[in-house]
Amino acid sequence: MFLRSDLAVTHWVSRSMRKLFLVLSLLLSQAAHLEGRKDNQFLWKTGPWGRCAGDCGPGGAQSRAVWCFHIEGWTSPMSNCDESSQPPKERSCFRVCDWHSDLFQWEVSDWHRCLLVPGAQGEPRPRAVECVTAQHGLQHRTVRCLQKLNRTMVSNEICEHFAPQPPTEQACLIPCPRDCVVSEFSPWSTCPEGCGKKLQHRTRVAIAPPLYGGLQCPNLTESRACEAPVSCPLGKEEYSFSLKVGPWSKCRLPHLKEVDLSGRNIQDFSSDSNEQVTLTHQSYKAHHHSQPGDVVIGFQTRQVWCTRSDGRNALLSLCVRDSFPLTVQPCVMPKDCETSEWSPWSPCSKTCRSGTLSPGVRSRSRNVKHIAIGGGQECPELLEKETCIAEGEFLQPCPRYSWRTSEWKECQVSLLLEQHDPLWHETGPICGGGIQTREVYCAQSLPATIASRTKEVSRPVERTLCLGPAPSASQLCNVPCSMDCIVSSWSTWGPCVFENCHDPQGKKGFRMRQRHVLMESTGPMGRCPHLAESVPCEDPMCHRWLASEGICIADHGKCGLGHRILKAVCQNERGEEVSGGLCPVPPPPERMACEIPCRMDCVVSEWTVWSSCSQSCSNKNSDGKQTRSRSILALAGEGGKTCPSSQELQEYRLCNDHSCTQLYWETSAWGSCSENTLVTALNVTIGWNGEATCGVGIQTRKVFCIKSHVGQVMTKRCPESTRPETVRPCFLPCKKDCLVTAFSEWTPCPRPCQPGNTTIKQSRYRIIIQEAANGGQECPDTLFEERECEDISLCPSYRWKPQKWSSCILVPESIRQGRTGTSEACGKGLQTRAVSCISDDNQSAEMTECLKQMNGMPPLVQECTIPCRDDCTFTPWSKFTPCSKNCEATQIRRRQLTGKSRKKEKCQDASLYPLVEMEPCPCDTFMSHPYGNWSACILPEGKRDAQQGGLWVQGDDKECGEGVRFRAIACSNINGRPVDPSFCNSSGYIQEACVIPCPFDCKLSDWSSWGSCSSSCGIGVRIRSKWLKEKPYSGGRPCPKLDLKNQVHEAVPCYSECDQYSWVVEHWSPCKINNELRSPRCGRGTQSRRIRCVSTADREGGAVNRSLCNQDDAPQETQACSLLCPSECVMSEWGTWSRCPQSCDPHAMQRRTRHLLRPSLNSRTCGEDSQVRPCLLNENCFQFQYNLTEWSTCQLSENVSCGQGVRTRLLSCVRSDGKSVSMDHCEQRNLEKPQRMSIPCLVECVVNCQLSGWTTWTECSQTCGQGGRMSRTRFIIMPTQGEGRQCPTELTQQKPCPVTPCYSWVLGNWSACKLEGGDCGEGVQVRSFSCVVHNGSISHTAVPVEEALCGEVPFQEGILKQLCSVPCPGDCHITPWSEWSKCELTCIDGRSFETTGRQSRSRTFIIQSFENQDSCPQQVLETRPCTGGKCYHYIWKASLWNNNERTVWCQRSDGLNVTGGCSPQARPAAIRQCIPACKKPFSYCTQGGVCGCEKGYTEIMRSSGFLDYCMKVPGSEDKKADVKNLSGKNRPVNSKIHDIFKGWSLQPLDPDGRVKMWVYGVSGGSFLIMIFLVFTSYLVCKKPKPHQSTPRHQKPLTLAYDGDLDM
């Protein structure tokens, strides 16, 4: 009882204590909560960061406000907030300045792949159940702010100062998810032999990776236990054991505690048991190997343990048999690369002020003191650069550079003429289109303020300093052609006048005629002929009386004697009316006697006007004559005055009695413009050099008096008034001094030394920018200077100087004994040596100097071996046996075993220890064979004239003709080893002559002479032509468009003066009465006259062919006439019609009159004495206007093919009826005359493509081997103009390089994993390297050669050695990579969604023991992009049903069976099952899971959708009995139709039990039919209402619907 009560008390106390503890805990928790709430009531709050202040760059600072506030929103003292969590008030920043915009920029990457939008909190989005085509995605890109110079990333705030940050993400669409697709499993592996538990496995590989959120790949491996394992018999071990070695430890030096390890034991910590391995050790004696100071030898160890085939550890003794594996070895202690301190920063590269505020660059460097050894840290960057800004207010502005040009050189017409005709040669002055060139160079641009103060011209610099395209160095130009004046015809000879009417002297005068300039001369050689001619004459008179006669007025009565009134006016030599006081005294009488015939008198007409003079001048043989005549109008009656004789009816007088020899002034060409000191002193223009260079000068010429047909005569024979000027002012051409640029800077000499023992020269040049002209200072002779570089020493060369190798260093004896238990100093060790850098004079140098000049550094450490007692020993190798001259011979060397090795069996294994070595003998027989294709035909290079600006001229590189083509030769020895072509006595090429056909242009004849004008009066056409001589071929210039006769024509308008040929008429013959028997002989008759066509230019007035005169204006040769009888009234001839107004107003009248000469005897009234008629246009009234032709084509001078020409148009006077008339008609009416009858024009020059010369051949594209090419290029200087030869497409030429052998280091394959005594575990793989010779591509045909031919070894230890592992039995290991799958595109509806496809490969793991499967690695899937992929689709395939079961699998469109890829929702059923079971006769379970009927039966379904029974189709050949018989006749049913309608004819439900759509359709259609029938019945049965209202007037029926159904 006591015990029980005691326990109860104890229990009560403990419960009370627990309750008390719980209450205290709650109190403390509440207090802490309240305190925490108190602390959390005050929080820190910060404002935005202010502007960055300070210097530009990273040295700025910015601040912000920080305060404490209560959670309710009011500000609190700072002490209420926790000071430890107070945010900082200041921070450093990068102050952005304006010039930083050139330093920093946003760098935007390409958009990444479109990825699915992640779900909330970064979780993967749940896969959509239905995805039709695409799903929403998101794609990102990287946006960062970069410093342009070194491409380093800086804060985004810097770039945001200049431009907003580009977006980093955007929405996109991606295809529906695609699951991982894998292949089918491989067959199960065979079970391993032996007893015990064994596993077998099977694997599959990845075909396509998961994309766009698809499912990951399933397991690629499966394992299972072998069936019926064989139990191990008694006495046999169930497990196998393997010695496993671990990785080597890091290299270290021995510690002091490892000095003496004698007698200690080493625990085998790798074993699961507590087995100890006891090893005895000798005492450690310290000794040191001599090592170079840079290399320290340490040691490294590894663990060794025994593992069982099930993966468990076992006793080490179960694995160690003959020899224990190596667990300790010497190694090189790691040593990092050692560099010097940074050098001081170099000066800022920008030492001037530019407008762009772009920064400069400064750098600093450091040198390598010692390279990394033993796997130490490699050397860091040795050069560092950063941007800098040169500060200072007095910085000079940065130089700017721009393209400059010289003046254009003289226009060279010959360049184009040679293109037209290669055989052209200069025979005289040439003109027309040409090409001119100029020099283009780059020079420093001087500011305007500096350029105005300095006299120095620009200095050429490197062309690379100028930005932008260079100006053109050539252009088309024109040398103006000279053309003489075009003058009018001569005027008529004027009267005989004094030479100077203002001061008449002497008794001799001159008769003169003039002509005027129609078109001025052009060009420097254009001349005008003389414009005035004179002939001397007697009795000159400057003023003459000109009298006009009135009609005859009878003095008494109406007939008999009378008088005429004479009206005289005084005219000067120009025909102008002047005062009568100037004419000679006395003036002509005012009255002149005349006679009026009486009634019976003979009546004669008035005198006609004097005819034109028969000759323009008189000579000894003939004189000029003029005639006038009158005719008998009426015969005399009885007692009347008789008619005059025929001689009295005509009068003659002399005219143009001056000589036919004319006098005129002839002038020489104007001389050059020369200075006139009086004039130029007043017209001074000061040039930049302070000398008078321009002004006004004078030109002079000589004047000669020429007598036609004689030559020069005395000047006094010619009238002084027409003497041309001999002096005229002119603009004195400016003197142009030669201007050259300043010399360029000397090309730099190498600093501070020159490589090689050659003479280095530096040069400079200058360019002529203006040639001297007009007596200016000539150009200097020296434009290029060269000199040797002075005080330049040879660059020192450096080389490595290795010391002797040290003795072989082994692991210290104490450590070797403690790890291996042996004291013999043998085995593998290391040798070291020191390597120093020395110059040519054996002086020590920095290691950096050798590293710059040499490729790598000689090795500092090498492996060595100290033979042990049990090792095999040999004699040294003998020398190789001599070689014979046979190329197939070999040479041999031998060695022998020595000592005890001769008795050891392992030493006699020739595969391990060969005693004989053989190698082929060198062969001196070489063969050559061609390689590659022939090069293009290469023409020999010509010399280029520097003065031609790089254009084609005679003697330049040819474009066609004979050339050479090349083919490379490969040289090899008899074994196929490539050697240098010189061994085959060859230059490396086969050369073959070739020909490039020369292009021939279309050749036309010269222009024929111009034909005569097609019109003899007015405007016509002149034609000239060319005809084809040679057709073009081989790319020559094409021909212009030719006519059917292979001719090309050119037509220009022409004008012939209408008075050039005129009709001359003689007087009418007397009127011949028709009836001669009549007396007196009067009445009607005919009269005739003689007409002839004469040339107005012919002095003699001789007749010409009548066809030259205008036939429309030919005068009548016969006309009707009348001879009035004595008793008849006689009237005078009709006067001329009065002039109509110029407007030809039809209301205006034209009038003519005549007067009575003799009244009739019987007082009959005479005829009318006046007539009027209206002014009708184009009948008796004409209007006149100037007619202009169109501008002609551009006319060039003779023998000129292009350039400046003249377009002309012709002016004629045209009557309103379209007839061309003399220009006098338009001139007399003062019509406005067009000003310009010619304008300059330009005929585009046909220019062949102008090319530069070929550049020098480039270096070979390969330093050795086959397939190397060298090339040269040329450039288009001036493209083709017009129909010139096109530029060749081949602007680059290539030819093969000589085939020289290539020597390369080749790495061998990795060796098997060497474990050095272990069975599995961690080991090392090595591979060797060798020097091979090849022809440019390393293949299996590469031949190993001497290593010296390949130079320094470029491989480091990491390339020649790598760690590896060998799995132990029982370990889980990974398989090799599978083959890459086919390239597959992502496609939607059979169309590619992306341009690149994907390939996949995988590797999985193999389980050897289920106990170790947790330690297996993960399976790996690797994907890479690919091109040339295809679109594949995946479909479900199924086998035939077998007992309502079948196999279903997914197959790719190329026939590959896969897992994945097909839609799981569309997977067909693999098991067929109907519920309820199909027990009706002739029924079976269909694929859809519902009961159907066999062939020949149709389904009768219940309303519930289940099968009621199977009904036999009538006419079916199936003889099975029906369940129910149908009444009626059995009609034959087409079985095919039955098959078509079988699936839906009587089945209202689909296989899923849902109502089919046709049921709804039939129901809806039936309902509509019923409504239609009811509505129709209603209309048929409805009674029509009688119409009781009175009919209204019918309105016309319209087509508008008014709502009445009856309509």
Curated annotation (Swiss-Prot):
Positions of disulphide bridges: C411-C477, C431-C481, C442-C466, C602-C643, C613-C617, C655-C660, C738-C779, C749-C753, C789-C795, C937-C994, C960-C998, C971-C984, C1002-C1039, C1013-C1017, C1121-C1125, C1249-C1287, C1260-C1264, C1297-C1302, C1372-C1416, C1383-C1387, C1426-C1431
Signal peptide: 1-31
Localisation: Membrane
Matches recorded under Pfam families: TSP1_ADAMTS, TSP1_spondin, TSP1_TSH7A-B_C, TSP_1
Organism superkingdom: Eukaryota
Keyword Lipid biosynthesis among record annotations: no
Keywords, sorted A to Z: Disulfide bond, Glycoprotein, Membrane, Repeat, Signal, Transmembrane, Transmembrane helix
TM annotation in the entry: 1557-1577
Membrane topology recorded in Swiss-Prot or TrEMBL: Single-pass type I membrane protein
InterPro entries: Spondin/Thrombospondin_T1, TSP1_rpt, TSP1_rpt_sf, TSP1_spondin_dom, TSP1_TSH7A-B_C
Principal localisation: membrane
PANTHER family: SPONDIN, THROMBOSPONDIN TYPE-1 DOMAIN-CONTAINING PROTEIN 7B
Annotated protein name in UniProt: Thrombospondin type-1 domain-containing protein 7B
Classification lineage: Eukaryota, Metazoa, Chordata, Craniata, Vertebrata
